[in-house]
């Protein structure tokens, strides 16, 4: 009897919510998908951005809603109301006024960003006015499909797709690691010459396709011609960081055991492998160098993501109890101007990604650093509502604390790593990445590691001056020349 009463109460509660909540009805056209859809449907609303799907997640003000559906046929509507997962408020609690609105149906075919994943279905932007009447509803038809990107090759810029058995086995489908290869001008002029390879890992959101357009600079470090390989690391859950993980799969092993041998078989490489990257790319190349130390000659890491989890933004993950608030109850910044003045906060960044659920920065960290949970998703570093840190999850993150790893294992690693690593960063980094770098610097001093740390004026973006980049290239060129001398002995 009690179970029956509870069931009836639940039914009436759902009925009441549906009856008195703001509703959006979303469908997709048969031309965009000619079969039933199972997955997540997202709604993006913005007061300022005429194309809400292009908004910078966690930075631009945005209302987001998501529902999970099964077997929805073309033309059949899905209702998004107060039962949806919502940020920052439920549909009925939204401020009344004028909004731009778009919907997207996520087929999750492997692309990183939901709004830009090839195959996903989305609606044209609409301008709507949400009034006081909650019975007012809005209808959207998704009839656009995100197209596959086409790589435009030139004489010196080529696309390279390496089949990966390791990642194919993990994802249970055919999988390739994709890159853009920029050849030096000397490659065709001297057909017998072999060249060092410079692997460039892009930052979060970077894409190797762009190199077909932007790869205009000569493929050199200093005056040394190189084969430059642009790796973007994009995967369905974010940036793979080329680290083996429970959620993304064995990206590090796939790159080193499968991609690199195939690349060196196809192009005239001389065996010298150099690494560089900025931001998430900066973290990735440090990870690769420190975990495959004999494979790479040198690494120049620029403004790497958090290399010491005692400073994950403004949070000490090992001692602090809350990701959103500091000990005085103040919001922890997620992004700053000049490293001092917040323009976003971790709470809003994390909570909006709790709705969007995959492919953005905070979720990307979890996909790399966390174990896979019982629900098949990466374990959360914190409670998405309160910000309380899950110390059980932090235990797994420790494996990816590069500073901690080097400190604890330097005795065994020193022979293969001494002199190979240079880290540079701006002293006013927007995401406060300079603080964990300085902590790592102190740890490396303590173990007497031969490792260069260089600090420059500027933030995450303005730091990359001509002089900054010249210093970075100079280090790599010098290390390469030392490698050549060793090889001749």
How would you name each of these model-derived features?
Residues 31, 47-489:
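Non-catalytic cap/lid and distal C-terminal segments of serine-dependent acyl enzymes
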Residues 40-48:
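Residue-level hotspots within well-ordered secondary structure
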